[in-house]
A protein has these predicted regions:
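Glycine-centered hinge/linker elements that transmit conformational signals in sensory
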Residues: 38-49, 84-147, 197
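Structural recognition of the beta-strand scaffold that forms the well-ordered cores
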Residues: 6-10, 62-65, 163-168, 193-196, ...
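Short helices/loops that flank or line small-molecule/ion binding pockets
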Residues: 15, 40-48, 52, 151-165, ...
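A local structural motif
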Residues: 22-33, 116-120, 134-148, 161, ...
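Extracytoplasmic/periplasmic substrate-recognition and gating elements
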Residues: 138-141, 180-240
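Bilobed periplasmic-binding protein-like "clamshell/Venus-flytrap" ligand-binding domains
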Residues: 50-67, 240
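Periplasmic solute-binding protein
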Residues: 1-30, 42, 66-113, 206-220
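A ligand-binding cleft/hinge motif common to bilobed small-molecule-binding domains
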Residues: 167-186
Length: 240
């Protein structure tokens, strides 16, 4: 199986807490919930990092990411970060004529990535996306996050002090539901949820939003039927 999606992750229990909900509404003038756009995501990041600060005596953060110079840092942007902000065009499969990486394609061939050559890799949406990545990493994530790689940062939300993560892979699901984790209830159910990715201000209806590695799913006959049914529902969710 090489099929996974990049989605929004959040602490459902904190987002459902009446005290936190009331405090957020008083500060920002709207209800705490899954953010549809990056502006709301930033509000929530600021809320938990700055205005909440601690929950149950533990310092909490409104954002998690990674920034160490490493091959995995490339995935942070190639996995559709620029297009989530609104870089690229409407069109199948990944934006046409300008795709999710900001590369202009003509007759199935790349012809340019810069604005001067018809691309969008250094356009307003791409610049905005990069700046927000830097700003949020510095302002709202744990101090160690900029020095982490993809693999090092992935398990961090399971420690229980992260409120949300805009760039989270479903491949981390198995590591987030183990017994005894701070993000798992006593009955084994998760305290967290995932949701569709919020989009930036340059994004328009019809543009690609989010990312998935399209591969294959293998459901073994030897797997109990109830677990196979659950896996089939999960497969439909991450590919929808």
């Amino acid at each position: 199986d090489q099929q996974f999606a990049n989605l929004y992750w959040f602490r459902y229990d904190w987002f459902s807490d009446e005290g936190l909900k009331a405090k957020f509404a008083k500060l920002y003038g709207y209800d705490l919930g899954v953010p549809i756009n990056w502006s709301a995501y930033e509000d929530i990041a600021e809320f938990f990092s700055t205005h909440v600060g601690e929950i149950d005596g533990k310092k909490v953060y409104g954002h998690m990411d990674y920034g160490k110079k490493d091959p995995s840092l490339g995935w942070r942007f190639t996995d559709a970060w620029l297009s989530m902000a609104g870089a690229g065009d409407v069109g199948i499969p990944n934006g046409l004529p300008v795709d999710e990486w900001g590369i202009r394609v003509e007759n199935c061939r790349p012809v340019g990535s810069s604005v001067t050559r018809g691309g969008a890799a250094n356009g307003p949406a791409a610049v905005y996306a990069l700046q927000k990545y830097i700003d949020w990493l510095k302002a709202y994530a744990p101090s160690e996050a900029p020095g982490m790689t993809f693999s090092e940062s992935g398990p961090v939300p399971a420690q229980g002090h992260i409120a949300q993560q805009i760039f989270w892979y479903t491949t981390f699901t198995a590591d987030m539901i183990k017994d005894g984790l701070a993000v798992v209830n006593e009955d084994g159910t998760p305290k967290w949820r995932m949701a569709p990715s919020p989009h930036g201000p340059y994004w328009e209806e019809g543009m690609k939003l989010g990312y998935q590695d399209t591969g294959a799913w293998t459901l073994l006959k030897s797997t109990p039927l109830d677990r196979r049914k659950a896996a089939w529902l999960y497969a439909q969710f991450v590919t929808s």
